[in-house]
């Protein structure tokens, strides 16, 4: 589905269905340099379980036009504008990595529009190494290489996909490679500069779930302590054997966890 948001075309995957006013809505928000396709399994699953699903391409990503937004706050305002364009009063938000910060900011700043959030592969602050930032700014393929190597657990570096012949890291690498020049850098810089996450987390009033990979090297479980302490009564699921790219590494375990708040 293509809609107009702030004068640009925004693409939202809805499982080829119209938004129905009598159904709850789940919005899926992708991470840095990615697009809606990372949520294909999850969005189809929840569409088949009685929900409207809206899996967005952020501006400048995937099929959405416009330039990448500069800050997490701007991205959160854009997500709310998507809800407005679709005449959705409130929704549950599921975000991965950068998307988790966007979901957090939405819940803190627009509490009347958000009924629950699930933060997948998250932490706050979400610091990005100079090596990745510099490579991304230079549009150096090394940025993609580092993110795919560090973004998966060691066991999944060598396979582990239940679908024979499909390489986890290879698919994610190709997704990064499809992103437009500069997109990854804008996203990673937004993560790095969003320093108010724990303050905003204290304002969250809706049910909140953190889904973490036990072997995540980009947002390690130990780094989430401040976030867990700031959010009022969060649910926390740590998935054994999973790294940062949880949607790919542990899709079924992630779906099971999401049902706690969706």
Language-model segment annotations:
Residues 31-34, 97:
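Active-site glycine-rich loops that stabilize anionic/oxyanionic intermediates
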Residues 101-146:
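Flexible "cap/lid" loop of the alpha/beta hydrolase fold
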Residues 22-31:
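Short beta-strand element of the alpha/beta-hydrolase
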Residues 7-15, 40-48, 52-98, 256:
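Active-site loop/oxyanion-hole signature of alpha/beta-hydrolase fold enzymes
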Residues 242-255:
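Catalytic histidine-centered segment of alpha/beta-hydrolase-like enzymes
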Residues 204, 210-212, 216:
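Short beta-strand/loop motif that positions the catalytic acidic residue
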Residues 221, 225-244:
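Catalytic histidine neighborhood in serine/cysteine hydrolases
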Residues 134-203:
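Conserved alpha/beta-hydrolase catalytic His-Asp/Glu region
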């Amino acid at each position: 589905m293509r809609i107009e948001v702030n004068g640009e075309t925004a693409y939202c995957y809805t499982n080829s269905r119209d938004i129905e006013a009598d159904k709850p809505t789940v919005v899926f928000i992708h991470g840095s340099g990615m697009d809606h396709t990372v949520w294909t399994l999850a969005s189809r699953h929840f569409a088949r379980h009685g929900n409207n699903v809206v899996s967005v391409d952020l501006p400048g990503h995937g099929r959405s036009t416009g330039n990448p937004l500069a800050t997490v706050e701007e991205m959160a305002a854009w997500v709310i504008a998507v809800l407005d364009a679709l005449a959705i009063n409130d929704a549950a938000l599921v975000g991965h990595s950068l998307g988790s910060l966007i979901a957090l900011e939405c819940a803190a700043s627009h509490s009347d529009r958000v009924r629950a959030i699930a933060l997948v592969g998250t932490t706050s602050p979400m610091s990005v190494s100079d090596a990745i930032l510099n490579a991304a700014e230079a549009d150096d393929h090394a940025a993609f290489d580092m993110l795919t190597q560090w973004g998966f657990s060691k066991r999944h570096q060598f396979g582990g996909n239940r679908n024979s012949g499909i390489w986890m890291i290879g698919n994610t690498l190709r997704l990064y490679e499809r992103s437009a020049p500069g997109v990854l850098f804008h996203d990673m810089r937004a993560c790095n500069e969003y320093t108010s996450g724990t303050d905003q987390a204290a304002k969250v009033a809706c049910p909140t779930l953190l889904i973490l990979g036990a072997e995540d090297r980009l947002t390690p479980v130990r780094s989430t302590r401040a976030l867990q302490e700031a959010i009022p009564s969060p649910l926390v699921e740590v998935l054994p054997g999973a790294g940062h790219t949880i949607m790919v590494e542990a899709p079924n375990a992630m779906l099971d966890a999401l049902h706690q708040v969706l």
